[in-house]
């Protein structure tokens, strides 16, 4: 596999093209098509889609009935066939063609000098400004072979064009109105296996119609788990009674990958790389997709499959799509605000229901002054407010150990006071020292020994205190560990931070926690003094504070052990949501993180923390992730306490999104990294 080649990584480059139409002049239109086709060829495009009735113009009306025009269209189709012999893209071109006793509005699919097939428009609008049935016949029930000059090609709406040398590229074509009907041809085609759905459109523009198209194209891509490539007619079409905007767009599974400006001058293209591997993954996971196929077997099975060899380009041709650095954290400010609002309230409502079900016990929580416990505390405070319970029912304990920092301890103390919760400090050092002495640990004899036992004794003592305090006060222990820590197994099992009575952070990744706290500050959920402490928490480095510093080295850093959470959350999302192989994850990570100046950052993200990572670093931390996720940490997830799912990226509950054996080897994933991911 060529690691740097996007086609090798499951991507297919597609283009939606529009041009200056010359109505009634097929030769001029064909020249425009070929210019755009050559540009697409140079850019490594696999599929290029043009507007409806590309060669004649859409607004030609009764001129469609002229033999001279129809013959000229056929001649230019043949010219394009010859001229495209050495071009990479599959060309999807609109043309009025004669078949039997009628004229059909068709898409001619051409590749490397061959007409692969001809797809007629199924549904002809004859309402409001449209009068297509006056000149044209519907093709919804046609399933035959059409002649274009001396060429013969399959004809019908039931054609799938599959690349024999590129797993995942299966093209279907529909035309304009076809996507406006309740059951469009593309829906049946997707069930039959199409992954790229093309729409050649005329679609004159009126106020609001562009948004209608966007909704329909987005919905089609989401429902069909497919890419939807849309190209509308634009400049040059007749404005006798109508106007045209040349809208082009590419959607993938509900996500907009590319869109051109509207009302463009001249020739324009929207180009993007569609992830067919992602689409196939989604279909495999969503069993109801195949159930729907079985239900509509009679419509799906007759589809004809035409194979061709694409012969995609080799080497690094870039990646023409945005890869979000933080897949759990959208860079769009409006979306981020909405996500934070929903995530926070999912957590609050989850805790509210648990409190109601238990007849309002006290909430016992260990507060360290770090991100996770801080966020859990403000969720608990809001839940109490909404349920009309006093915040004093939250029993917050700070449990300083051998290396608890002054700043984190101060953050915890000030936050609890500002919120008005019941706050107590219990120093665990005496208890931890006693346990270390009882088990004969070298630290109890004055030796420097900061091993895993030293760490876990502290973590275990803290949790033991919290559970006994919950017993004493009639409360429940509120867990604070987040999704990222669960994915990496960065927790102490059993009598440790892995266990609680209810964990509201279990579905929230570390990278999102920071933005949730920022959102809480920005949306003024609490008083000004609370906001000041929350900002101080955000400015503190992530550390479990279990191992002392020697005075010169930095305090124990979690990210130095398990990797940057930005990278590990990226990997976790790709595994949970799509099940991608490590080399695909490395490829995506490299495109997302190799250059801090490319792509968008979430709003408010600190400038000094906008880092980049080399492929060597990405490879190293991916190996750590794979080892910990697949081989080391599943036993901790198999015994998770309850907690709400938050992100569309997934969760790790063994009762929900992630069910896996606790005794599995990570060998095949590690081997794939060694084999397929270069170091530079």
Curated annotation (Swiss-Prot):
Q: Where does L-glutamine bind?
A: 127, 203, 209
Entry's EC annotation:
6.3.5.1
Q: Which PROSITE patterns match?
A: CN_HYDROLASE
Q: Which reaction does it catalyse?
A: deamido-NAD(+) + L-glutamine + ATP + H2O = L-glutamate + AMP + diphosphate + NAD(+) + H(+)
Q: Name one GO biological process term.
A: NAD biosynthetic process
Gene that produces this protein: nadE
Report what the protein is called. Glutamine-dependent NAD(+) synthetase
Q: Name one GO cellular component term.
A: cytoplasm
Residues given in the record as deamido-NAD(+) binding sites: 456, 485, 490-493, 636
Q: Which domain of life is it from?
A: Bacteria
Keyword set, alphabetical order: ATP-binding, Ligase, NAD, Nucleotide-binding
Q: Does the keyword Nucleotide-binding apply?
A: yes
**What Gene3D superfamilies does the entry give?**
Carbon-nitrogen hydrolase (3.60.110.10), Glutamine-dependent NAD+ synthetase, C-terminal domain (1.10.10.1140), HUPs (3.40.50.620)
Q: Which residues bind ATP?
A: 366-373, 480
Q: Active site at which residues?
A: 52, 121, 176
Q: What does this protein do?
A: Catalyzes the ATP-dependent amidation of deamido-NAD to form NAD. Uses L-glutamine as a nitrogen source.
**The family this protein is said to belong to:** In the C-terminal section; belongs to the NAD synthetase family.
Cross-referenced CDD domains: GAT_Gln-NAD-synth, NAD_synthase
Enzyme class per UniProt: ligase
Alphabetically, the GO molecular function entries are: ATP binding; glutaminase activity; NAD+ synthase (glutamine-hydrolyzing) activity; NAD+ synthase activity
Pathway given in the UniProt record: Cofactor biosynthesis; NAD(+) biosynthesis; NAD(+) from deamido-NAD(+) (L-Gln route): step 1/1
Among Pfam families, the record links this protein to: CN_hydrolase (PF00795), NAD_synthase (PF02540)
* Residues annotated as domain CN hydrolase: 12-276
